Swiss-Prot record:
InterPro entries: Aa-tRNA-synt_II, aa-tRNA-synth_II, aa-tRNA-synth_II/BPL/LPL, Asn-tRNA-ligase, Asp/Asn-tRNA-synth_IIb, NA-bd_OB-fold, NA-bd_OB_tRNA. PANTHER family: ASPARAGINE--TRNA LIGASE, MITOCHONDRIAL-RELATED, ASPARTYL/LYSYL-TRNA SYNTHETASE. It catalyses: tRNA(Asn) + L-asparagine + ATP = L-asparaginyl-tRNA(Asn) + AMP + diphosphate + H(+). This is Asparagine--tRNA ligase. GO terms for molecular function: asparagine-tRNA ligase activity; ATP binding; nucleic acid binding. PROSITE patterns: AA_TRNA_LIGASE_II. Belongs to the class-II aminoacyl-tRNA synthetase family. NCBIfam families: asnS, PRK03932.1.
Amino acid sequence: MSITSVASVFKGDFAIGSQITVRGWVRSRRDSKAGISFLAVYDGSCFDPIQGVVPNNLENYTNEVLKLTAGCSVVMTGEVVESPGKGQAFEMQVTKLEVVGFVEDPDTYPMAAKRHSIEYLRELAHLRPRTNIIGAVARVRNCLSQAIHRFYNEQGYIWVSTPLITASDTEGAGEMFRVSTLDLENLPRTDKGTVDYSEDFFGKESFLTVSGQLNAETYACALSKVYTFGPTFRAENSNTSRHLAEFWMVEPEVAFANLDDAAKLAEDMLKYCFKAVLEERRDDLEFFAQRVEKTAIERLEAFVSSDFAQIDYTDAIEILKACDKDFEYDVEWGIDLHSEHERYLAEEHFKAPVVVKNYPKDIKAFYMRLNDDGKTVAAMDVLAPGIGEIIGGAQREERLDVLDARLAEMELSQEDYWWYRDLRRYGTVPHAGFGLGFERLVSYVTGVSNIRDVIPFPRSPKSANF
């Protein structure tokens, strides 16, 4: 007797006539006049539930089987048989069924067998994994996570665990969550009346990280090729479908590399991940194509087969100015491109993924390498049809004097970045990397447009439930 997953049965791992046990939850029950019940049981291992054909001669048929409703947990034992119905090759002739847990009040069970709005499910994040859509998102998210680790491992990268608590603001934006154990009712004060953070747990003002990049650079400048993959935090008071206060970032960093190397790495990684999900999670993608985004599969296939276009920011501005599109935000040199501009370039002008390079220095971070023109930096954004920016990256400034000048320009303290400056003092080397917002990637693959629906427990302004 083998305890197995539903996915293994559908893969054909068990011959017709095999005795197996499947454990999971009831999605639906249908009773026939012939005294047979049909149970759809899922365990999360794949999109489709397996059908269990339950005869009325089981000893618990009347007092338990006929009381099963959506959400009840069961252990189902029986024989693998060919399914005469459409939609799946196998089903189970059940010889034993154990009810592990009933749903207390089926009439008030929030996840009863009916379709709910995605907004309703967001309020029940602890139960929404039981639905088709969130279960499919979770499997795709897992597939993409595994593909990312596999890609970098195959390329010889070392995964580095960067700290979640930091005293550095990577973006220089100041939108950070403060970490403190000070008593809010009795804050220590300096002679000037400001909060005395020397009395705090870390002896200085500390925050949740907005990026692992600066820390990753230190390891890239010793181990050559590294990447981080972990949570990051932004205290940005934006209540939109594109923003989260807590999200995951993938950040590779490569020594002896320039901006073109980073762009090639981004292209290779995205195509690798999309190929993986097309091969491994076809069942879930077919659901998304049917219910969420009809081009879900075709879009990924087109992406994988596309050559990335490359264009300078200055040329992109000229293209946007020359087009007859009525943009909400005016286009002029020096602006940070908005989503509408990004999507026009990727979807209408190039009709392919686009790498926009060499942005004005005044709209980019201090650590990005200053170009010879003195006006732009070696920064890039990867724009994807259907979503816009999906990756942002740069070649890092490896020249200490130029880095110091940029810090001064942006009124940042050399003292705060002493360790980062040391990398330029002791065997400096050109290096480059990028950041991929993982939830944005999951959103792109699934077609689920609100980023709060592609992370298990979303954190956003005024919302930290569960």
